[in-house]
Amino acid sequence: MPPYLYRLPTTSLITFSAILNDPSSSYTTILSDATASRTKLHLALKGIADNEPGASALAVLDAVQIYLPYLKGIIACLDADELLFKGEPTFQWRAPLTHFSFSSPLLPLASIHSEHLMVVLTYALALSNYAHSILASLPAFEIPAGPKAMPHMSSEDEKRTTAGLARAVDLLCQASGVAEWAAENVCLQVEPLKGVSSGRLGKGKWPAESSRETFKALSMILLADAHLTAIRKLLFPVLTYTLFAPPGPPLPPNHPSAPLQAKLYLYVHQLYSSARALLSVHHQPTSSAPSNSSRKLFRSNTDKDVIEPEAVEGEIIPELKRYLAKEAQLALALAHKWLGIDAGENGKGAKVGEALAWVKDAQGRLEDLEDSKMRAKLKGLSIGKSRERKKEERRARMGRVERELEVVKAWVKAYQKMNDTVAFQPVPPVSSLVTPSGRPIFGPKAFIPPPSKFSPSRIGHLNEEQGNDSPELGETEDTSYAGKGNYF
């Protein structure tokens, strides 16, 4: 059930005073505070990785909110040559979206911009995981498949569910905006480094997280998850009707528009499909991969304790591939279901054959998802995941598919009977029908990064001399900005 639950990055400890030279001794206290804020982020991520009590995505978001302004200040001072690296810098991170044959190693990433990229990635993934935790804490409100107990909700549960769904949509839109911003800003600063490091260190590939395509795809995935959550919220008011009425025609008077739902699902399918295409753009085929001796990611004599992978192919983890394949197929099936319902309910009896074509196609696609061959194919992409987690995800997936398949079968039966007894219309092939374009109901929430905690002193002095009170220069700690306080 969307949103996807991501594994968050982890990192090693860093002491900024040990890797940075402060010629003017003006930043001693600030570097100490920056080290403390990064340590807080390290501990929050480690707590989640180790399943420690009290660890949560919310704690990670809080740590990123504190650390990011310090990191921006350090980058500004490095650009102004007020801080200098004592040697070649490496920032050790585990890449959560890159597939490795064995356990994910700590990768020594070069440049402060790589650190910035991984922190922003952590922020986007933590926002999505926080939305996931909110939805997981809500009372069950969808109708289960089969003869099971129906969910019972009090008025307080209904209010809590409505608020939780709305909050999750907002968080996912924020996460989509963060990923989109990173693709257009931070990734552009990392791109030049990849060529330099590749030539010096043996043409090793960078992890998938360093690619603009990955961040653009991630933004699409998060936006698609937000739309699916919004659809759940859209259907929530008709829950009472669907609990007691059998599936099939007619729709209740207050039911959301069938063509609207069809276009929403078509847009979701478009997002997932585009994300899958983007994630495969920068992958090279195995036959063209460099030899093992030349596929080291980053070698550094000063990082002997860092486990360096023999090969980093830049391929996305199989779990995410599996998720995209399943959700794209399911979204298209549901889009066709609602196109059929629109034709049957709003066609005034003139489009029964068309309606039957759409809902039969939806039934076929859902049966493909339920089919053992499709399940085996999807399961084969999940190697390396814990057995219990695979079972849990399979149960959740089959519950959704079975529930939708029961509903679609009811519509097929109703339209088939109508066509056999009243309409007598030919059933056209789906390929001959016109599929409308998808429709979004919102876009990514624009991300405006928080202001730097500090700025280069010479810029601050210049700002004072010119009488410029721009928040971009000098101290910006108390500056107000769009989205302030709305990180989680």
From Swiss-Prot:
Q: Name one Pfam family in it.
A: BRO1
Indicate the segments annotated as coiled coil, or none if absent: none
Q: Name one GO biological process term.
A: cellular response to pH
Residue ranges of region Disordered? 449-488
Q: What is this protein called?
A: pH-response regulator protein palC
Q: Which InterPro entries match?
A: BRO1_dom, BRO1_sf, pH-resp_palC
Start and end residues of each BRO1 domain: 2-430
Q: List, alphabetically, the PANTHER family matched.
A: PH-RESPONSE REGULATOR PROTEIN PALC (PTHR40463:SF1)
Is Zinc found in the keyword set? Answer: no
- According to its UniProt entry, this protein's organism is Cryptococcus neoformans var. neoformans serotype D (strain JEC21 / ATCC MYA-565)
What's this protein's function? Required for the proteolytic cleavage of the transcription factor RIM101 in response to alkaline ambient pH.
Q: Which UniProt keywords apply?
A: Coiled coil
Gene3D superfamilies given for it?
Answer: alix/aip1 like domains
GO CC annotations on file: plasma membrane
State the source organism's domain of life.
Eukaryota
Family in the record: Belongs to the palC family.
